[in-house]
Amino acid sequence: MFGWFKGRRSKETLKDRLELVLAYDRAKIAPGKVEALRNDLLEVVQKYFPSGNSKVEVEQDGDKVVLMASISIEEASLSTEEESAAEDKSDKPSA
């Protein structure tokens, strides 16, 4: 309920967020830009693999800001070349 029992203490969460803000500042990247990129990546992944459990995390690696993508690809969601070609044709407007 309200995220209180998720196992992370607010002190740890606050520390992680502060580290990310400092990393954004060092890299001269606006935090909103990284969050928008994260959301766009998730949207694209969901387009191709709608049933997979995917997440994109923003982490600090030294002085670098790193986006880590974890994409779960289920066998049933993989398309054959023929299905992909059919999808491409249906996306094109008819002349």
UniProtKB/Swiss-Prot annotation:
InterPro entries: MinE (IPR005527), MinE_sf (IPR036707). Pfam families: MinE (PF03776). Residues 86-95 have a biased composition (Basic and acidic residues). Prevents the cell division inhibition by proteins MinC and MinD at internal division sites while permitting inhibition at polar sites. This ensures cell division at the proper site by restricting the formation of a division septum at the midpoint of the long axis of the cell. Residues 76-95 are annotated as: Disordered. This is Cell division topological specificity factor. It comes from the Bacteria. SUPFAM superfamilies: Cell division protein MinE topological specificity domain. Belongs to the MinE family. GO terms for cellular component: plasma membrane. The keyword Cell division applies. Keywords: Cell cycle, Cell division. The gene is minE. One of its GO terms (biological process) is division septum site selection.
